[in-house]
Amino acid sequence: MVQCLVVDDDSRILNYIASHLQTEHIDAYTQPSGEAALKLLEKQRVDIAVIDIMMDGMDGFQLCNTLKNDYDIPVIMLTARDALSDKERAFISGTDDYVTKPFEVKELIFRIRAVLRRYNINSNSEMTIGNLTLNQSYLELQVSNKTMTLPNKEFQLLFMLATRPKQIFTREQIIEKIWGYDYEGDERTVDVHIKRLRQRLKKLNATLTIETVRGQGYKVENHV
């Protein structure tokens, strides 16, 4: 799954973009400042960044320059500043595209995909781990000639775990990514979804299993 870093000091914009990226099967990592974004990148790989210009501390121009020079990842500027001089400075800083606010989120996603294609970054809808193939477009699991369609949340949860084998995810991390920041339900819903996924994987005879890490969360293991 494509990993997209979104940096903006407006939490509403962060949540808005993240929710739409999620529906497009793009994993969003949101940060409120340039400094926080760089701290995240010390431990998390991303494929592309969407960043604001006007932020406290490190501004978008500085952040863009650092992302290009130190991490060599594509950047899209998303900003209310529409002066030609700002656009010139942004492209000098290394941005690959420039989108002004207010913006259409669908257009932003089109531009993200276009930049990814330019960099030959894979945003295909399928991934295979062990003997299991996951198809995001159809929410399907396949092992040999057996195919199973999952409910949306179950598929998103399994796909998130499968993209990072052996990485432990807490319930809080899972809820934030799959159900969103404003989810107010019981966190035990994660356990219910995990139980169902285990049953489905067993029925398919998948080599992938979901393991419980006591006191921490869940991870996937591939038994080949």
From Swiss-Prot:
GO CC annotation: cytosol; protein-DNA complex
Keyword terms, alphabetized: Activator, Cytoplasm, DNA-binding, Phosphoprotein, Transcription, Transcription regulation, Two-component regulatory system, Virulence
Tree of life domain: Bacteria
Location in the cell: Cytoplasm
Family annotation (Pfam families): Response_reg, Trans_reg_C
Annotated Gene3D superfamilies: 3.40.50.2300, 6.10.250.690, Winged helix-like DNA-binding domain superfamily/Winged helix DNA-binding domain
Sequence ranges assigned to domain Response regulatory in this UniProt record: 3-116
Coiled-coil residues: none
Post-translational modification, as annotated: Phosphorylated by HssS.
Main location per the UniProt record: cytoplasm
GO MF: phosphorelay response regulator activity; transcription cis-regulatory region binding
A biological process term (GO) from this entry: regulation of DNA-templated transcription
DNA-binding residues (ranges): 124-222
4-aspartylphosphate: residues carrying this PTM: D52
Entry function: Member of the two-component regulatory system HssS/HssR involved in intracellular heme homeostasis and tempering of staphylococcal virulence. Phosphorylated HssR binds to a direct repeat sequence within hrtAB promoter and activates the expression of hrtAB, an efflux pump, in response to extracellular heme, hemin, hemoglobin or blood.
Name of the protein this chain belongs to: Heme response regulator HssR
Source organism: Staphylococcus aureus (strain bovine RF122 / ET3-1)
